[in-house]
A protein has these predicted regions:
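N-terminal beta1-alpha1-beta2 submodule of the flavodoxin-like/Rossmannoid cofactor-binding fold
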Residues: 1-65
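FMN-binding flavodoxin-like domain, especially the glycine-rich phosphate-binding loop
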Residues: 44-139
């Protein structure tokens, strides 16, 4: 188990949630609720990595789901963010995983990985490896 939690946002498709479950992480995994505005009522109290999909084809600020923006607007949540894993569709070209890029640029944390839609086993292994390199022990 690593000294870092996972916070994720997964819409109705459930792609991000399924990916987080495949990691079989052992730490706390917190889901930002889909209900609009509910992200601002959720606070974390330990360091975490954010797993986030890209919305709207990656165009501008709308690339970051509203619930995730609300969550990150809470100062304490932003302070504990240590990295971001992005999910997207390569059909959107330069906007692939744009939400992760925008969050990284705004907060100064690294983009740990970019995952196509719901990811492959290779993506799961890559994310596990990178989390281990960044935060310690084997997953």
């Amino acid at each position: 188990m690593l000294p870092i939690d996972i916070v994720y946002f997964s819409n109705y498709s459930g792609n991000t949630k399924r990916f987080v479950e495949k990691i079989d992480y052992g730490n706390i995994s917190i889901n930002i609720p889909i209900d609009r505005g509910s992200g601002s009522s959720l606070t974390v109290n330990s360091p975490y990595v954010l797993f986030v999909p890209t919305y709207g084809g990656g165009e501008g600020r709308a690339a970051i789901p509203r619930q995730v923006r609300s969550f990150l607007n809470v100062k304490e949540n932003r302070a504990l963010l240590r990295g971001v894993v992005g999910f997207g569709n390569t059909n959107f070209g330069e906007h692939f995983c744009k939400a992760a890029d925008l969050i990284s640029a705004k907060t100064g944390v690294p983009v740990i990985a970019k995952v196509e839609i719901f990811g492959t086993q290779q993506d799961v292994d890559k994310v596990k490896e990178r989390l281990t390199l960044l935060y310690g022990q084997e997953l």
